UniProtKB/Swiss-Prot annotation:
It is found in: Cytoplasm, Nucleoid. GO terms for biological process: cell division; chromosome condensation; chromosome segregation; DNA replication. GO terms for cellular component: cytoplasm; nucleoid. The lineage of its organism: Bacteria, Pseudomonadati, Pseudomonadota, Gammaproteobacteria, Pasteurellales. The hinge domain, which separates the large intramolecular coiled coil regions, allows the homodimerization, forming a V-shaped homodimer. Residues 326-492, 534-632, 863-942, 1005-1171, 1235-1291 form a coiled coil. SUPFAM superfamilies: P-loop containing nucleoside triphosphate hydrolases. It comes from Glaesserella parasuis serovar 5 (strain SH0165) (Haemophilus parasuis). This is Chromosome partition protein MukB. The gene is mukB.
Length: 1496
């Protein structure tokens, strides 16, 4: 892909017109192609007729229906055989209907095969026969079938009719079908060709110069047909004038195609970049696939390798475990024999210890029960005494509360009666209606009170006169009774105290001696008190006796313990040692033996500790090496990969560093070569850009200056020179080959001073650009150069250069060479860029290796040292295992010696006790004395407090207080009399208080109100007293109830405690023991000692029993373990054998596929199975996603998940490698290893990305360049239109004296051009946006600068493509100069018919000439196309107009076919008279041809 100028300006020059006469003189003269004849076969009226066509004008003259239109229709059909276009409107023959698909052609044919054939002669002198075969198709639609064909290499003397027909007899002929025609020329020099498409047919006609334009599409055919149709029917065709730009202005397909190619290249470039991104993602996917598959398979591979190694190790361990179990079983059998013997001895001594322990335990329980009973008795005695005191106190308090309650009850009753009486009085007073009634009521109440007092006192004669005397008497009696009550109360209190003392003393006697008669209580008390001092003295001696007994029992116990220990020692030592000397000597022997064993064991332990330290050191070294080993293996893998990438073998780190320096040097050299090639490529691109300029201008400023001066570059004038002439003209002009040809140098001179930017040397030549003469210099060819005389004194000699700027052909030839060199340079640059990136990547790998692995890569293999350490460690382990048995024996002997020494240490201090033989008798005697003292102590403890209380009050037992009940009854009677007397006193006092009421009998009415008030006050006072009495009664009642409840609870508690006390005393009597303070402790000590001995004995027995059971169980387990170990060993060995088969298959697959190196990653061998499984599982999850779209790999991956077949994983890895190998582009990447391919792919993709990015910058075109191209193209077309106008200057038809074309630039598009060239920075946001194509940016700019224009629903891409067509920037109009109106727009309504026909013909001639110029580059250089137009109904033209047409045809070397009625008689050309005749019922057209008959 070249630069922008090569894209957009290479085809602009196709529209240049050869106007310089010196250029034409340099090119050999080429004659124009001509139509020679028209042949119609089997048409309506023409069975076989050939019309020879004149070189200028051929006229068909005849009346209506003579066949003129049919002849022209045959010509048009042979020229354009397209049924979609053919439409002969002016025909009236039968068969032409509006619904017929032949559009008037069906009726012009006869049944059978028909032909319309054109014979022409091109510029090369070749005879070309082309035409169509027509045939009617039966049916209502009246279709016509058309087949086009051509013939070449036909002899000149052979007519067309003889070719298409075959004579049958003397007077008949047969029309040949196409197949017959083809068979006729098979094997001959004649080239017959039938065309299956109209495009191929027209391409043939164009290539041989029959038609002026290559008709590629139906649109081109439609234009050509409309041009023929317009010329046929005459006049100004509105179809052509409305789209005059499409006809006159050539479609600059080169520029549009160049723009499309540029956009397509940019789009392709960007798509390639996107594809590179996709490829990079694919590369990442490949990289991920190979990485994850390697992790997936290698982790499983190493896990199986570790498992296989572990299985072998386990098999060895199982075998060792089997042998160890056997040795353990033998040792346990020996231990079982020893423990069984000791067990028998322990069973014999256990029974005696159990009996002693049970006896001591029973004695302790008895003592503890006695102590607990004694404690309970003492506690209950204290509780009973306390409760008795509290009961007496509560009884006295209850009696006081009962008295207070009775008094409160009496006061409450009296207050209640008084309130009721006052209420009744008040009720009576309230019922009275007046004061008299009230007093009467009071009087009545007084009378009632008197009657009540009489009843209470029993005095019938009581009245107001003696009430005071009786009241005084009753008060005295009440005082007397009160004194008596007080006296009785005192006597009752004293009597109560005496009774309580007697009762208490009696209770104490009964408590001590049991139930006793009240009369004998005094004698029993004296007996108890007389024996009390002696019992108390005996009780005090119990403590000393108890201590003495304790000491004796302890010595006895020590003696028994010593005897037991001595017996146990003799049993264990298997000796009969009894005296102290033997024991001491034996002790010294055992002490010396113990020291020897301890020294030997310490030395042994020290040696074993040293071995363990060595083992720990070896383990640490092994661990360090194990930690270093993965990194070392990783470094080795990296080193191997680096050696593969470098193609070198490194022996040391210095070699790596040296190679790294060499790589850096190679990178610098390759970088210099790459940069040099890049500069060379840039120079070649610039040269290509200059050669791609349409006019050969090497400096863009020359084009701008030529446009500014209104001139033309001289190289543009010589654009069409041949390759042979280009060196001559280039040498002729020398440095002036880039000169500008201007019309007037003086006019340009004034503008030179205002130039800001121009080349260093600017050459200007005066001359007419449209008719430039090369006689500027006097020159003469001299050998391989030319001598140019610049002046009389200055000549210049220039040699013919190999490459000349002049001429498009020369530049194109040089452009091909430069492009070839550029392509070669580009390829070399790509290779060097790849080498640079390869060196950079290699240097990066080296740097990464140096930074990460260099420190470990060249160190020795840690696994070798690990194997040596493992051997040493195994030897130490063997020694430690052997030493373990020896140490166990030493420790067993040491424990036996220590146990004997411990027993001796216990026995030796007690040898003196063993000699005391009277110890047992003294213990028994002291125990009897202690029992007597304990009985007295128990009696004193039980009844000592009672005797102490009885001693001061024992005198009260002498007299029994039996009169207490009589005194209590008298006291109660006196209290009743006191109450009755108080009621009498109260009744008499009430009468005395009412004495005033008795006087109300007569004077009631005067004092009622005061009495009522007095009653109310009394009632209020009485109610308050009643409430107080009630409250006091409630309080007294509550207090009495509370005291009564307390008394009841105390009495219940006293009874319960007393009963329990009696029961406890009875139980103590039943036990028959008396406790002292140390009895329980001694019994417990004795019991604990025996319990400890028994416990130790049982513990030892239990231990021995357990040991026996453990040994038996251990032996059972060992038997099972031996069998299991043997079974496990054989099972493990089978596993090893089976795993070996599978492993051999895996190794075979990996080695045959050359993937073992990838899978055997030793750095993974030091990870656990779980870690490896985790790596494999993670990789499996990633692989499931990666191969989801690949059914083959997906199935293989699914099969590889079977853990029973590890070889499937290797198969999957091999398939992945094959899959990646198949996707390696061998033309790009020269390797079979996918990993190396990924590395090279990264380098290649990086290089392509850089190259495409720079290529995109080169492909981009600036808006200013587009504006210049469009402006230059528009200027050239304007110049061409100007030249076309010059050919129409002398045309005159009627009043029309001239015809011209007017071309203008549209205002909206002119604004767009200005914006493209002048406002680049302002609109850079559009053209620098990579998301927009150039066409879309151009459309958006057009909308931005012309916001008033509505673009409709078209897309920006479509609008932009239209704006790249310069024709859309121009408006074309046809103007005529007619009479006094001057120049005006050509319209049919403003012209006569003849004027319109002539004007239209002039326009059509311009179109044909424009088409020729447009297609000049697509034709051969030695061919000029034929020019032919039609004119039907030429009778509209006068003779002058006809002559004008003849002149126009002669001047433009054009042929004209005219159809005119009989009154038309042209003076020149060939005229055919057509007359339709009927002979023998056969219709035919009689044709007579004449040349120039008008002048005859």
């Amino acid at each position: 892909m070249t630069e922008k100028n090569d894209l957009f300006e290479q085809n602009v020059t196709s529209q240049n017109i050869m106007v310089a006469t010196h250029v034409q003189s340099s090119i050999p003269s080429v004659s124009r192609s001509k139509f020679r004849s028209l042949t119609l076969i089997n048409w309506n009226g023409f069975f076989a007729r050939t019309f020879d066509l004149d070189e200028l004008v051929t006229t068909l003259s005849g009346g209506n229906g003579a066949g003129k239109s049919t002849t022209m229709a045959g010509f048009v059909t042979a020229l354009i055989p397209d049924l979609t276009l053919l439409n002969f409107r002016n025909t009236t023959e039968a068969g032409s209907t509006s619904s017929s698909r032949d559009k008037g052609l069906y009726g012009k044919l006869k049944a059978g095969v028909c032909y319309a054939v054109l014979e022409s002669e091109n510029s090369r002198g070749q005879r070309v026969i082309s035409g169509v075969r027509l045939q009617q198709i039966a049916g209502r639609d009246k279709k016509v079938d058309i087949r086009s064909f051509s013939l070449q290499n036909i002899n000149e003397n052979q007519s067309v009719i003889s070719i298409l027909t075959e004579q049958v007899g003397e007077k008949n002929a047969r029309v040949l079908a196409l197949n017959d025609l083809k068979e006729k020329f098979d094997g001959s020099e004649v080239q017959f060709k039938q065309y299956h498409s109209i495009t191929d047919y027209h391409s043939f006609l164009f290539d041989l110069g029959v038609i002026p334009k290559r008709l590629r599409t139906s649109g081109d055919r439609s234009k050509f047909y409309k041009l023929i149709e317009a010329s046929l029917y005459g006049g100004i065709s509105s179809v052509i004038t409305k789209s005059l730009r499409d006809y006159l202005l050539p479609e600059n397909t080169g520029v549009r195609q160049a723009f499309q190619d540029m956009e397509s290249a940019l789009r392709e470039n960007r798509m390639t970049l996107e594809a590179i991104k996709v490829t990079q993602s694919d590369r990442d996917m490949f990289k991920k696939l190979i990485t994850e598959s390697t992790n997936y398979v290698s982790a499983d591979y190493m896990r199986h390798a570790n498992e296989r190694r572990g299985n072998v190790q386990q098999a060895i361990e199982k075998r060792q475990e089997w042998y160890q179990s056997k040795s353990k079983l033998t040792l346990e059998q020996q231990r079982l024999v020893e423990f069984s013997r000791e067990m028998q001895d322990l069973e014999q001594g256990e029974s005696s210890l159990e009996a002693e322990y049970n006896s001591a335990s029973d004695h302790l329980n008895l003592v503890m029960n006695a102590v607990r009973h004694q404690e309970k008795v003492e506690r209950y005695q204290d509780d009973v005494a306390e409760l008795n005191e509290r009961l007496e106190e509560q009884q006295m308090a209850l009696e006081e509360v009962a008295e207070r309650q009775e008094m409160a009850q009496a006061r409450a009753t009296e207050a209640e009666d008084q309130v009721e009486e006052l209420r009744s009085q008040m009720a009576d007073y309230q019922q009275a209606l007046d004061a008299q009634q009230t007093r009467a009521l009071q009087y009545q109440q007084a009378v009632n009170a008197l009657e009540k007092a009489k009843q209470i006192s029993g005095l019938a004669n009581l009245d107001l006169h003696n009430v005071e005397d009786y009241h005084a008497e009753f008060v005295a009696q009440a005082d007397e009774i009160t004194d008596k009550v007080f006296e009785l109360e005192q006597r009752l209190s004293v009597s109560d105290m005496a009774k309580s003392q007697f009762d208490k003393a009696y209770e104490l006697v009964c408590k001590i001696a049991g139930e006793t008669d009240r009369l004998q209580a005094d004698s029993v008390a004296r007996e108890l008190l007389s024996a009390y001092p002696s019992q108390k003295a005996h009780a005090q001696q119990a403590v000393a006796l108890r201590q003495k007994l304790t000491e004796l029992e302890q010595r006895l116990h020590q003696q028994q313990n010593a005897e037991r220990l001595l017996a146990e020692f003799n049993q264990k030592a298997q000796a009969e040692l009894e005296n102290a000397e033997d024991l001491e000597s034996y002790y010294e022997e055992q002490q010396a033996r113990l020291e020897d064993l301890e020294a030997e064991l310490a030395e042994f332990v020290e040696v074993r500790s040293t071995q363990r330290q060595q083992r720990e050191q070896l383990n640490q070294q092994y661990q360090q090496l194990a930690q270093t080993a993965p990194a070392w293996h990783t470094a080795q893998s990296a080193l191997a990969r680096l050696q593969e990438q470098c193609g070198e073998t490194f022996d040391s780190s210095q070699a790596v560093m040296q190679f790294m320096q060499n790589t850096l040097s190679r990178e610098r050299e390759a970088t210099l070569e790459r940069d040099e090639l890049a500069r060379r490529e840039q120079l070649l691109d610039e040269q290509i850009s200059r050669l791609s300029q349409p006019d050969g201008a090497e400096d863009i400023r020359l084009n701008q200056l030529a446009e500014k001066f209104g001139g033309v570059l001289i190289s543009e004038l010589y654009e069409d020179v041949s390759i042979e002439d280009a060196p001559y003209f280039s040498a002729l002009y020398g440095d002036a080959r880039h000169a500008i040809v201007v019309r007037n140098l003086e006019a340009v001179k004034a503008q030179l001073q205002q130039l800001d930017d121009c080349p260093e040397n600017l050459y200007l030549i005066e001359g007419d650009p449209n008719a430039f003469d090369d006689n500027v210099f006097k020159s003469e060819e001299l050998g391989d150069g030319v001598v140019v005389q610049l002046s009389d004194r200055q000549w210049r000699y220039s040699k013919f250069s190999e490459f000349a700027v002049f001429g498009r052909a020369s530049r194109e030839k040089q452009l091909e060479k430069v492009k070839a060199e550029r392509d070669e340079t580009t390829e070399k640059h790509a290779e060097r860029a790849f080498d640079v990136q390869k060196c950079q990547r290699l240097h990066q790998h080296l740097s990464q290796f140096v930074g990460t692995h260099l420190a470990l890569a060249f160190q020795p293999d840690p696994e070798v040292a690990m194997q040596e350490i493992a051997q040493k460690r195994a030897e130490i382990e063997r020694e430690l295992n052997q030493a373990s048995g020896t140490e166990q024996q030493l420790r067993h002997q040491l424990e036996n010696s220590k146990a004997q020494l411990q027993l001796l240490n216990k026995v030796l201090p007690q040898l003196n006790i063993l000699a005391d033989e009277t110890l047992q008798d003294r213990v028994e005697e002291c125990r009897e004395q202690l029992l007597e003292a304990q009985e007295d102590e128990q009696f004193i403890r039980q009844f000592g407090n009672a005797l102490a209380q009885l001693e001061p009050i024992a005198v009260a037992l002498k007299s029994d207080p039996t009169q207490f009940e009589q005194l209590q009854a008298d006291y109660k009677r006196s209290v009743e009399q006191q109450k009755l007397q108080q009621q009498k006193v109260f009744a008499l006092a009430d009468v005395m208080n009412r004495r005033l009421h008795f006087s109300y009998q007569e004077t009631v009415g005067a004092e009622g109100s005061a009495l009522n008030e007095q009653l109310r006050q009394r009632l209020d006072n009485a109610q308050r007293e009643r409430e107080q009495a009630r409250e006091q009664l409630r309080q007294a009642t509550a207090q009495f109830s509370e005291y009564n409840q307390v008394l009841t609870s105390l009495r219940s508690a006293f009874d319960a405690k007393n009963q329990m006390l009696q029961e406890l005393l009875q139980e103590m009597d039943e036990y028959g023991i008396r406790n002292d303070d140390g009895a329980e402790e001694r019994a417990r000590i004795r019991r604990d000692e025996l319990q400890q001995r028994l416990s130790q004995h049982r513990m030892r027995k239990s231990y021995i029993d357990k040991q026996v059971a453990v040994i038996q169980a251990e032996m059972d387990n060992l038997n099972k373990a031996v069998r299991k170990a043997e079974r496990d060993y054989h099972t493990q060995r089978e596993i090893v054998v089976q795993a070996k088969v599978s492993w051999c298959l895996v190794l075979k697959l990996s080695r045959n596929s050359d993937v073992e190196k990838r899978l055997n990653r030793r750095e993974l061998a030091y990870q656990s199975a779980e870690e490896l499984r985790s790596i494999s599982d993670k990789a499996l999850g990633a692989l499931r996603t990666a191969v989801a779209d690949n059914e083959y790999l997906r199935d293989s991956l699914r099969a590889s998940e079977d853990s029973r077949k590890p070889e499937n994983k290797v198969v999957f890895f091999i398939l992945v490698y094959q899959h990646l190998r198949e996707r390696i582009r061998q033309d790009i990447i020269k390797t079979d290893d996918p990993i190396d391919a990924i590395e090279q792919m990264e380098i290649e993709l990086s290089r392509l990305t850089n190259e495409l990015t720079s290529r995109e910058k080169k492909l981009a075109i600036s808006s200013e360049s587009v504006a210049n191209i469009l402006r230059k193209t528009i200027q050239r077309e304007q110049n061409r239109i100007l030249q076309l106008n010059q050919g129409l200057q002398n045309i005159a038809f009627g009043q029309v004296k001239g015809v011209r074309l007017v071309v203008n630039i549209r205002d909206t598009h002119a604004i767009l051009l200005n914006a493209l060239s002048n406002d680049r920075e302002q609109h850079s946001d559009l053209f620098e946006n990579q998301k927009l194509s150039f066409s879309e940016a151009l459309a958006m700019l057009y909308k931005r600068v012309n916001p008033h224009i509505e673009l409709g629903q078209r897309t920006p891409q479509t609008i932009g493509e239209e704006l790249l067509d310069y024709r859309n920037y121009l408006d074309l109009e046809v103007e005529t100069f007619r009479g006094a109106d001057g120049w005006m727009r050509a319209e049919s309504s403003a012209l006569s018919t003849g004027e319109a026909i002539g004007t239209g013909m002039s326009i059509l001639l311009m179109v044909v000439q424009s088409w020729e110029e447009e297609s000049r580059r697509m034709r051969a250089k030695d061919i000029l196309p034929a020019r032919l137009l039609f004119l039907d109904e030429a009778a509209r033209l006068d003779a002058t107009s006809i002559n004008t047409l003849f002149e126009l045809c002669e001047r433009l070397d054009m042929q004209l076919l005219i159809a005119a009625p009989e009154n038309i008689s042209p003076e020149r050309g060939t005229t055919y008279k057509l007359v339709r005749k009927i002979t023998n019922n056969q219709e035919y057209v009689h044709v007579v041809g004449l040349k120039g008959f008008g002048r005859v």
